[in-house]
Amino acid sequence: MPRTELILNAAVILYTMIPPDAHSLGSEGRVVNGNWRDTSDVKEGSLPREVTKQVNGSLSSRTKQVNEFSKHTRFLVDISFSCCSLINRSLWESAQKDELSDSFGKALTTKPECLAVRETPRNFRRNLCLVIPSLN
């Protein structure tokens, strides 16, 4: 299997590990104390009550879940985008040499925007679906 195809497969696998709730974090979240928080339902300058609430002087279970979720999500998103960056660099060269398998290689030669990954994991998934129909 060519290197580019391996990288794309790795990106797809990593993407599927990102929890569904994270798909909109790129546009509806922010970094707070080093952690990514979903702020889609929060006014600017505040955090959800359940996130900041403390129980008996210790962090609530919700806060712990958010922190854990943030760590894994940001790691997976970063790795996924790194994979896509590598793909974008070598994609057309590989496609021209016919190194990509028919499973998605032909789509790449006709749709240059397929792997134009720019914003959120949601766009990442949408673009990968153009390339690999089985993801739909």
Swiss-Prot record:
Superkingdom, taxonomy of origin: Eukaryota
Subcellular location, record wording: Mitochondrion
Organism listed in the record: Arabidopsis thaliana (Mouse-ear cress)
Main location: mitochondrion
Keywords: Mitochondrion
Protein name, UniProt field: Uncharacterized mitochondrial protein AtMg01300
Cellular component per GO, a single term: mitochondrion
Other noteworthy facts: A stretch of 270 kb of the mitochondrial genome is duplicated within the centromere of chromosome 2 resulting in the duplication of the gene. The expression of this duplicated gene (At2g07692) is demonstrated.
